[in-house]
Amino acid sequence: MNAIVALCHFCELHGPRTLFCTEALHSPHPQGASCGDSIGQGEQAEDEEMGIQMSSRIRCHSPAEGASADSNSPRPKKSDMCEGCRSLAAGHPGYISHDKETSIKYVSHQHPNHPQLFSIVRQACVRSLSCEVCPGREGPIFFGDEQHGFVFSHTFFIKDSLARGFQRWYSIIVIMMDRIYLINSWPFLLAKIRGVIDELQGKALKVFEAEQFGCPQRPLRINTAFTPFLHQRNGNAARSLTSLTSDDNLWACLHTSFAWLLKACGCRLTEKLLEGAPTEDTLVQMEKQADLEEECAAREVADGEEGRPRLQPELMEGRELSKCPTESSVLSDCSWNMVQRRMGVFRSLRHMRQVLGASAFRMLAWHVLMGNQVIWKGQDQELIQSAFDVLQAMLPVGCVRVIPYSEKYEDAYRCNFLGLSPQAEIPLHVQSSEFSVMVDVRHANRSNLYPALFVDDEPLSKYEFVVASGSPVTIDKVGLTILNKIEAALSNENLSMDVVDQCLICLKEEWMNKVKVLFKFTKVDSRPKEDTQKLLGILGASEEDNIKLLKFWMTGLSKTYKSHLMSSVRSPTASECRN
């Protein structure tokens, strides 16, 4: 956790002062750390421990040799400090603890060595002991800003028989630049810092009661004659916190507590990547997988009733994939599909665009996005399968219906991706239809028909691709908004295909969100056409092609989403009518 914990004191002579602070150093690491009091015991304890275990390290917190005060340090001069303003003795280098789990070192000094950190801690100290206080001047408070950091401050009093009012004012502050993290840590910090304060107050109270029992100060002050001149009572009003608590190991214990506080607070809250709600593609894939499993289970039951031997799950899965190529082609996690993708000729949309040409690819992509039937006719099944794998990436999973290869023509309602053998006959009305596009894969007459292709694309040099449709797409037409963005990404050579793939996913999610809004607006709420046109204008899809695309993509919504929307949207309306 990137934070600083500091103990501050309001000195009667010098005002707010920082007594002791602990910070976590990630890099650079301080060097020369050694155990001051018991080197052998300290090294043995470090070998046995994993992480920071403060109970066994109180006696051997090592002074940080590399953390000594620099001549250019912004810390106050000795003339501006008294016993109450000073924690570590002159020349004391500070304390350091090493966390083996995270390789973080927790270093404690009286002041931070870095000038910017010193300024931040100094300002937080002044504010915590002057203007930023809670009612009663004792308790927790939160303040800060983006420039100087955010501060959790807990002010408290320590009993002192020689101080004005028999008490001195202190505060423990936690400074962090992450406001949300600090606010979420409020309950934890309050409980742990309150424990440290209670321990300090308990020790000081025992010393105070012992001093009052031996030499009561209240009667002495009452009997003292009043004088208008300022003077320091008893000549020793500025007492150190070590003297007030009668604890010679106070600063080592505070280093222990503050270092543990930084480590524990950093471990209790961790950042997690939230995937959010499942996408429509995920829901559709889950539904298709569930249907496939139900079909397999029903077939097993039927085979068991007829006395047939039950197939092993692996064999059953393989048989289902071979018998149901349409279903298996849309499951991205099928091993069969991944093998075909690796062996395919077309590697990506950009590769296909380079092979077919910009105008032919635009026509083909337009028909794919609009839901028209895409027919590939040729002898090479691997080539056709790879083309379908690449093209269907532009569509939601629910809109994809594939027949990879067939000896006869299949109607458009059965599939929008159809692979045919060269001997298959295509009806004339399909060839002239504006709702279909055909790619005829022929053997090329010359081996160098595509000289722009790479050397490793030898299979493509054997073919000539003829793209034809009854509704050609003109280049000067504005067309589909999503198609224009896809072509812009594909034509930008500065973008790798990994970036283009992520761009394509974002574009599909953007337009699927528009589909969801339109579905709720028209199918669930049954709004009139005038309101629907206004909505389409707001969505940026008022053009005819975009409207057709939204209607086609609406068929790709999952059954789960549709049923959930129909059940959850209408219930509030019914309750409002009852009220």
UniProtKB/Swiss-Prot annotation:
<dbReference type="GO" id="GO:0097009">
    <property type="term" value="P:energy homeostasis"/>
</dbReference>
<dbReference type="GO" id="GO:0005737">
    <property type="term" value="C:cytoplasm"/>
</dbReference>
<keyword id="KW-0963">Cytoplasm</keyword>
<keyword id="KW-0539">Nucleus</keyword>
<dbReference type="GO" id="GO:0034198">
    <property type="term" value="P:cellular response to amino acid starvation"/>
</dbReference>
<dbReference type="GO" id="GO:0005634">
    <property type="term" value="C:nucleus"/>
</dbReference>
<dbReference type="InterPro" id="IPR021713">
    <property type="entry name" value="Folliculin"/>
</dbReference>
<dbReference type="GO" id="GO:0030097">
    <property type="term" value="P:hemopoiesis"/>
</dbReference>
<feature type="domain" description="cDENN FLCN/SMCR8-type">
    <location>
        <begin position="337"/>
        <end position="491"/>
    </location>
</feature>
<dbReference type="GO" id="GO:1901723">
    <property type="term" value="P:negative regulation of cell proliferation involved in kidney development"/>
</dbReference>
<dbReference type="GO" id="GO:0035556">
    <property type="term" value="P:intracellular signal transduction"/>
</dbReference>
<keyword id="KW-0966">Cell projection</keyword>
<dbReference type="GO" id="GO:2000973">
    <property type="term" value="P:regulation of pro-B cell differentiation"/>
</dbReference>
<dbReference type="GO" id="GO:0005096">
    <property type="term" value="F:GTPase activator activity"/>
</dbReference>
<keyword id="KW-0472">Membrane</keyword>
<dbReference type="GO" id="GO:0005929">
    <property type="term" value="C:cilium"/>
</dbReference>
<keyword id="KW-0343">GTPase activation</keyword>
<feature type="region of interest" description="Disordered">
    <location>
        <begin position="32"/>
        <end position="52"/>
    </location>
</feature>
<dbReference type="GO" id="GO:0030511">
    <property type="term" value="P:positive regulation of transforming growth factor beta receptor signaling pathway"/>
</dbReference>
<dbReference type="GO" id="GO:0007043">
    <property type="term" value="P:cell-cell junction assembly"/>
</dbReference>
<dbReference type="InterPro" id="IPR032035">
    <property type="entry name" value="Folliculin_DENN"/>
</dbReference>
<dbReference type="GO" id="GO:0046578">
    <property type="term" value="P:regulation of Ras protein signal transduction"/>
</dbReference>
<dbReference type="GO" id="GO:0005765">
    <property type="term" value="C:lysosomal membrane"/>
</dbReference>
<dbReference type="GO" id="GO:0035024">
    <property type="term" value="P:negative regulation of Rho protein signal transduction"/>
</dbReference>
<dbReference type="InterPro" id="IPR044886">
    <property type="entry name" value="FLCN_DENN_C_sf"/>
</dbReference>
<dbReference type="GO" id="GO:1990877">
    <property type="term" value="C:FNIP-folliculin RagC/D GAP"/>
</dbReference>
<protein>
    <recommendedName>
        <fullName>Folliculin</fullName>
    </recommendedName>
</protein>
<feature type="site" description="Essential for GTPase activation (GAP) activity">
    <location>
        <position position="164"/>
    </location>
</feature>
<dbReference type="GO" id="GO:0009267">
    <property type="term" value="P:cellular response to starvation"/>
</dbReference>
<keyword id="KW-0206">Cytoskeleton</keyword>
<dbReference type="GO" id="GO:1904263">
    <property type="term" value="P:positive regulation of TORC1 signaling"/>
</dbReference>
<dbReference type="GO" id="GO:0032008">
    <property type="term" value="P:positive regulation of TOR signaling"/>
</dbReference>
<dbReference type="GO" id="GO:0005829">
    <property type="term" value="C:cytosol"/>
</dbReference>
<dbReference type="Pfam" id="PF11704">
    <property type="entry name" value="Folliculin"/>
</dbReference>
<dbReference type="InterPro" id="IPR037520">
    <property type="entry name" value="Folliculin/SMCR8_longin"/>
</dbReference>
<keyword id="KW-0458">Lysosome</keyword>
<dbReference type="GO" id="GO:0070373">
    <property type="term" value="P:negative regulation of ERK1 and ERK2 cascade"/>
</dbReference>
<dbReference type="GO" id="GO:0051898">
    <property type="term" value="P:negative regulation of phosphatidylinositol 3-kinase/protein kinase B signal transduction"/>
</dbReference>
<dbReference type="GO" id="GO:0032006">
    <property type="term" value="P:regulation of TOR signaling"/>
</dbReference>
<comment type="similarity">
    <text>Belongs to the folliculin family.</text>
</comment>
<dbReference type="GO" id="GO:0044877">
    <property type="term" value="F:protein-containing complex binding"/>
</dbReference>
<comment type="subunit">
    <text>Component of the lysosomal folliculin complex (LFC).</text>
</comment>
